[in-house]
Amino acid sequence: MREAPFTVCVIGGGFTGAAAAIACLEHVRVPFRLVLAEPSAALGRGVAYGSHHPLHLLNGRTRDLSIRAGQPGDFLNWAFRQLDQGENHAGLHEGLGHTFLPRQLFGEYVRQRLYEAIGRRPDIDFALVAEAARDVTEERGRGYRVAFERAEPVRADIVILATAYGLQTSSGTGALAPFEAVPGEHFARAQTILLIGSGLTMVDVLLGARRDGFRGKALVISRRGQLPRTHAPRGVVPQNVALPRSRRVSMLATGIRIACEMAQENGTPWQAVINGLRASLPELWQGLPVAEQARFLRHLRPFWDAHRHRLPMEIHASLMEEFASARAELLRGQVKGVTRTRAGFAVTLLRRGREAETLKADLAFDCSGFRPDLEQPLIRGLTEAGLAEPDAHRLGLAVEPSGQILGKAGRPSPGLYAIGPLCQGTLWEITAVPEIVRQADRAAQAIATSAAPAEPSLEATAASS
């Protein structure tokens, strides 16, 4: 018999943490204690869906997003009711499913679904700790102790790391973080802004700067010169692809390219092929030798990201107009250093076949993407204790498909899970809504098994009769 109720502590209360909490509330059917640790007031939103700007749109269609496993149309149904269209208008319902709604609206949906899930479980004890977890230590035979700066420590049977990218928001280049608060008048006065990276974050910053009054030139630096592609005009049915059985990433890349070309020849958008690959990507990734995975990361990742992480058509059109009108310029090269000056920023750029050059800008933003911070105290403490290990590429932590963290010598750490982007190095396709929800659901099912009371043994039953 337990001295205290079975306790699950979810560290991180953005989208990933909300998905983990909702899944546990769905699957763990015994009374338990749920602790959610999140210092931000934007519960359920996180960085991804915390924007309050109505023109910051989701990069996935409404019909494809849901925080509830097995209910793919949940966000669409919720949004339809919010827009007060009445669910009997099937045509409007279908049309809404193909749209890209504001991220703020999705954040509201996640937050509401989280509190609804809590409300449906009067048998649980829910606690919100408005702080970031500082340390997680193992207590032999008693689970884990989660420590905070000021709040009382929490003893937990299960700890789920759901900090998305581990609280790291830039690569430490010296440039501004992508969503760092910059007064609008600074954009209005700026003649040049420089953006390191050419993915979705760059698009947010560039178009946001325009909305805030920036009228000057934008310099976009990209090692491979790739920009995000556009979604198809309407949602496409994912197309199953028979790829060659190969442990070489070059063969797989060729197979994907040929499949996209054949789809287009048959009148099917290439986006259907990319969408069809998503479910099988973790298996494909794990089937590659580490050296081949590293080759993909060095050479092919920018091309994959440009086709996988796409833009709504209207946003893509605005981006293309920036370059067509020469208000923005794409420079292929590698940033070797960023220095703050009295006038702004000096960025050292190395382009192929040229000597290093210095570019000057009034503002410089690191848009190279979020990445896990494996050196933050929380993660470092786990690795030093042998409870966790970085994956082979140091993109995150080594995990099993369910998210159970692998510690020293590849041994699973009982009761310790990571969900979402912290698992990217192991599972690869684990940064988008559907994949995070599926992984959270798998983890919650495993947790439910450990939470269930043990069946009495035959000997105990016989002795009591």
Locate each region found by the language model.
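N-terminal glycine-rich dinucleotide-binding loop that anchors FAD/FMN and/or NAD(P) in oxidoreductases
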Residues: H52-L76, V236-M251, E314-A317
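Long, low-complexity, intrinsically disordered segments
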Residues: S457-S465
